[in-house]
């Protein structure tokens, strides 16, 4: 196995006390956020569950700012997600907007990669993002934890893999210090998400 399983991600969410508002892990058929009056988060795979999944992204809804935050560890645009994975987040955003009173949702997303394409750590980075959304529901990308990551232009072959590799260490250090489930299962989790797991550079 490579990457993170749904069960592992759910256990880390529980270990970090991020269950409040967490809707769960979903495949590409995630319906979007329906209840607009409460804070919600979700981890979504770009592939169908029956095929084992492909790539994890994370979503957060803040009712105060009326913003939906979308985090993709690889920083892909909607067009790139469609090209590489056959996945589009546009429908999720539209479904969320249709369920709101004014049918209007502001989408804020990261535009740079923080994960190297050689690693299987997308699920773990999603956990870090949910933690940032817990710290600052209206500005998760502005937290000091998220800002400690070095953003790079997205691409199958990273321009500066060394910087992205440092992000992976920041990620592991964060989980090691905050997440008891990670500490208990670190050997297997790191083995399945490690750098150079996939040959991209």
Curated annotation (Swiss-Prot):
Originating organism: Snake adenovirus serotype 1 (SnAdV-1)
One GO process term, biological-process aspect: proteolysis
Signal peptide boundaries: none
Entry annotated with the keyword Cell cycle: no
Note: All late proteins expressed from the major late promoter are produced by alternative splicing and alternative polyadenylation of the same gene giving rise to non-overlapping ORFs. A leader sequence is present in the N-terminus of all these mRNAs and is recognized by the viral shutoff protein to provide expression although conventional translation via ribosome scanning from the cap has been shut off in the host cell.
Regulation of protein activity: Requires DNA and protease cofactor for maximal activation. Inside nascent virions, becomes partially activated by binding to the viral DNA, allowing it to cleave the cofactor that binds to the protease and fully activates it. Actin, like the viral protease cofactor, seems to act as a cofactor in the cleavage of cytokeratin 18 and of actin itself.
Cellular localisation: Virion; Host nucleus
Catalytic reaction annotation: Cleaves proteins of the adenovirus and its host cell at two consensus sites: -Yaa-Xaa-Gly-Gly-|-Xaa- and -Yaa-Xaa-Gly-Xaa-|-Gly- (in which Yaa is Met, Ile or Leu, and Xaa is any amino acid)
Active site feature: 55, 72, 122
HAMAP family attached to this UniProt entry: ADV_PRO
Record-given protein name: Protease
Gene name as annotated: L3
InterPro entries: Papain-like_cys_pep_sf (IPR038765), Peptidase_C5 (IPR000855)
Self-association and partners: Interacts with protease cofactor pVI-C; this interaction is necessary for protease activation.
Enzyme category, top tier: hydrolase
């Amino acid at each position: 196995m490579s990457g993170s399983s749904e069960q592992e991600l759910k256990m880390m969410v529980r270990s970090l006390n991020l269950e409040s508002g967490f809707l769960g892990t979903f495949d590409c058929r995630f319906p979007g956020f329906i209840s607009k009056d409460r804070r919600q988060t979700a981890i979504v795979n770009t592939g169908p569950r029956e095929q084992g999944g492909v790539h994890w992204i994370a979503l957060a809804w803040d009712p105060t700012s009326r913003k939906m935050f979308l985090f993709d560890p690889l920083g892909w645009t909607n067009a790139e997600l469609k090209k590489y994975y056959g996945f589009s987040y546009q429908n999720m955003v539209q479904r969320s907007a249709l369920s709101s009173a004014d049918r209007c949702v502001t989408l804020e997303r990261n535009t740079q990669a923080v994960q190297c394409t050689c690693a299987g750590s997308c699920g773990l980075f999603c956990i870090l993002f949910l933690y940032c959304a817990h710290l600052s529901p209206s500005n998760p990308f502005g937290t000091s934890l998220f800002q400690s990551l070095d953003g790079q232009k997205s691409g199958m072959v990273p321009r500066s893999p060394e910087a992205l590799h440092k992000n992976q260490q920041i990620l592991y250090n964060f989980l090691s210090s905050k997440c008891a489930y990670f500490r208990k299962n670190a050997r297997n989790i790191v083995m399945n998400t490690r750098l150079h797991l996939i040959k991209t550079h």
